[in-house]
Amino acid sequence: MKQKRLGGLCAAAIFLLCALMTGFYLIAGYGAYLDSDMASELALASHLAKEGALISSTWAYSTEVRVLSTQLVFTPLMALFPHNWRLVRTLGCLILQAALAASAYFCGRSLGARKRFALLFAGLSISVCSVVYAQMITIGAYYVPHAVLTNLYVGLTARLMTERKHGRRRGILALLIALSMLMGASS
């Protein structure tokens, strides 16, 4: 029992360390990493905040469709802080990292991992483990919505496979179908 508790505390400490390091990385390193793609995400959020919408009919990307993407986080923040893009970017990335950690934990638990291992998975999912990961997930946040959706999809699929109650299975299946359509519309 004592060893199990120690393992849980160790996992919680590692998760907290990962979260603190990622938070510090986002807050302290913001200025060094802003590029035109990141700025365009904020320009879209500013545009949507002025329109009062989360999805724009007047802004189009040349290569993708955006339904469930970073604008769902950045736009409300831009409406709250329209003159502080740095704050919007930093808070938005922190919120997206929290969503990524939560979805990783859900996925791990749904796949049958013990709480401590799911917590480690959540911590590692928000850790800067390479330059590319930092650019695309941590700082850029471009693929965080896709990673969150994938974690949710895998977790729900695992729950569907283990759920025995017919009514719950139908509910999970309906969620998976809706999530599939949203993922398809969010290329």
What would you call each of these model-derived segments?
Residues 84-87, 112-119, 166-173:
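Membrane-helix interface segments
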Residues 63, 67, 115-161, 186-187:
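Membrane-interface micro-motifs in multi-pass membrane enzymes
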Residues 91-116, 152-155:
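Transmembrane-helix motifs of polytopic, lipid-linked glycan transferases
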